[in-house]
Amino acid sequence: TFDVCYEQLFFVGGNWK
């Protein structure tokens, strides 16, 4: 889902929004 993609992207960046 879109949420998962967004979650992974932020996690990889190291900045949880």
UniProtKB/Swiss-Prot annotation:
Which reactions does this protein catalyse? D-glyceraldehyde 3-phosphate = dihydroxyacetone phosphate
Q: Which EC main class describes this enzyme?
A: isomerase
The molecular function terms of the Gene Ontology recorded here are: triose-phosphate isomerase activity
Q: Recorded E.C. number(s)?
A: 5.3.1.1
Keyword terms, alphabetized: Cytoplasm, Gluconeogenesis, Glycolysis, Isomerase, Stress response
Q: Where in the cell is it found?
A: Cytoplasm
Q: Which signals induce this protein?
A: By water stress.
Annotated Gene Ontology cellular components are: cytoplasm
**Source organism, top-level taxon:** Eukaryota
Complex formation:
Homodimer.
- Protein's name in the database: Triosephosphate isomerase, cytosolic
The species this protein was found in:
Pinus pinaster (Maritime pine)
Q: What is the lineage of its organism?
A: Eukaryota, Viridiplantae, Streptophyta, Embryophyta, Tracheophyta
